[in-house]
Amino acid sequence: MAPTVMASSATSVAPFQGLKSTAGLPVSRRSNGASLGSVSNGGRIRCMQVWPIEGIKKFETLSYLPPLSTEGLLKQVDYLIRSKWVPCLEFRKVGFIFREHNVSPGYYDGRYWTMWKLPMFGCPAPTQVIPEVEEVRKEYPDPYCRIIGFDNMRQVQSVSFIASKPPGCEESGKA
């Protein structure tokens, strides 16, 4: 048997010409008066403050900010609900890690907080979480209360921030 040859229609493709110029990209454009030597944030330095290294305890994610208002808490809880995380409330009398009975880390050194009720699975709105924070404050007026965003798909705590602090330690940071 003789092999058969099939005629095919060949399409011509333009040969590779190399990379295009990046002159059209915004990164490479510079104004005529701009040079690297004129870059400065000196105007902003006057309004910056340095966080003191002693005397103010740092707690959770947002500890560098002033205490959150109810509106701020609503926005944070809305963020964790939109991220598909489950809101949980925890409270503890001492809001930081300490070692009282042993030098090695352990269960009783403040890493674990007491959970308030159950995680709020299926919570559709942040307005359901804030009344629970108020209920913790009524039941236990002195402890710290934090809100946790729990990712039940990855089984991890994704976000944690202080919702309320005991009276008298709002600005001083002394617990």
Swiss-Prot record:
One of its GO terms (molecular function) is ribulose-bisphosphate carboxylase activity. GO terms for cellular component: chloroplast. Coiled coil: none annotated. HAMAP family: RuBisCO_S_bact. Keywords: Calvin cycle, Carbon dioxide fixation, Chloroplast, Photorespiration, Photosynthesis, Plastid, Transit peptide. This is Ribulose bisphosphate carboxylase small subunit, chloroplastic. The basic functional RuBisCO is composed of a large chain homodimer in a 'head-to-tail' conformation. In form I RuBisCO this homodimer is arranged in a barrel-like tetramer with the small subunits forming a tetrameric 'cap' on each end of the 'barrel'. GO terms for biological process: photorespiration; reductive pentose-phosphate cycle.
